[in-house]
Amino acid sequence: MKKIFGLLIVSLALAACYSPDPFEAETVEVVTSQTSKMGKLFHVNGMEQTCNPSVSNDVENYPASMLWLNFNRLKVKAPDDGYTMEGVTQHDRLTVSDTAGKVKWYLMVDKDECQFQDPEWSTHGGFIVSLRGNAFKNGKLSCGGALNYGIFAIRMADKKRFWFYDKDISEEATPHLWVDESATPDTSASDSTVEGFFGTDKVRLTYVSDDDEIVFVDFANGGLKKAKKLKKPSGRSNWRIDSPLISPDGNFVVYNVYDNPKTWEAYIQELSENSTPIKIERTAGMMSDPAQPHWFEFKGRLFVLWAEFPSNSQMLNKADLANESVQDGSAGRTVMRELRLTPDAPSDLAFEWIDAAREIAPIPMTGGRSPDGKFLATGTNPAFLLKLP
C-alpha cells in the first residue's frame, strides 16, 4: 500500500481487518443467543474476531446469515472436510454462516493466494465481490509482507470467479458490485465474459483507488476502458473514502469519508463524473454522523441504514453487544431513514428525505439489513446477527 504512516494508523484503527494482530477478546462464557426487547441476538463465530460483516442478500438460499472474514480462530460448525478448522490463518476464507453457527457457504484461498479482503454481498443475491491478495518472492508465494490485490466476483452457485483486476488494487479498495436483479446466472454459459458470467451486461462496479477517489465502472457502457472517477466532497480532499455501496437501482453510492478515527461524515452521490456529493446531515438527536451507511429496500421503499456511536468514539464496535448493560444505546445505536432518489436531476432534486431518522436497534449494527427486513448484521469484536422483533 502506498500510504504514509499516519494515515495507515487511522485506517487500522477504523477497519481493524488490516491489523496483523487479532483483537484478544476477554475470555467469557459465550452466549449463543439472547432475547430482549430489541429482538434476538446471535453470536457469529463465538467471541472470536471477525471483520467485513455483510448481511445475506439471498434470503432464500442463505436466510438468517451473514458473510464475514476470519482471523486465526474459528467457532463454527464446518459443513465438510474442505472447511478446515486447524491451521487457520488470517482471511484465508470467505464464510457465510447462520444464527445456529452453521457454515452455509465458503470459499478458501487457492494455493497461489495469501488472503481475501473487503468481501461484500452484491446487490444481487447470487454474487459476492472481494479483494484477493498475494505476493511472490523468487517465484514462490510469500505472504509475510506487503501484498498485491485484485478485485473479483464470485458466483455463489458454483464458486467460480470473474476477475475485474488481477493486481495493482489498493488493499483498502472496499469494492461493491451492482447486478441487475432480473439476471439469472447460468453456470453452463461461458464465464469468460461479463454477460456470460452474470447473465447480463447490466453490471456496475465501484471501488476506492490508490489516490483515494471512487472509481465507477459500467459494463454496459464501455466497461473498464471507460472507468470514471467521482468528485470528492468539497473541502475533504485529504479525507479518506470508505466503502462506497451502490444503491439498488444502480445509480447512486452511499459512503463515509473520515479525517481521523473519531471524525467522519457520510455522503450520497450519483454515479456520474459531474455529480456533487450530498452530505447526510447530522440532525438533532443523532449521537454522531452516520457510520457505515447501507442501502435497504423494502416493498418499493428505499432507506439508508447507519450506525451511530457516542461522542469521542471510533467508528468501530468493540463492545460485547450481548451484555445487557450496553443495550441501552451507550455503545451506539442503529438508525434508518427513508428517502427518494432521482437520477439525472439537479443536486437539490437528486434526493429527498421522506421522514425523520428513527432508531431500529439500541446497539450499533454496521453490516446492513437483510432484504426481508428481519436481520441486522455487525462485526468486529465480536460479531452478531440481530433478529428484529
Language model regions located:
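Alpha-helical and His/Cys-centered functional microenvironments
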Residues: 11-12, 53
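C-terminal motif of bacterial Sec signal peptides marking the signal peptidase cleavage site
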Residues: 14-16
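Sec-dependent N-terminal signal peptides
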Residues: 6-10
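Sequence signature of WD/YWTD-type beta-propeller architectures
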Residues: 20-389
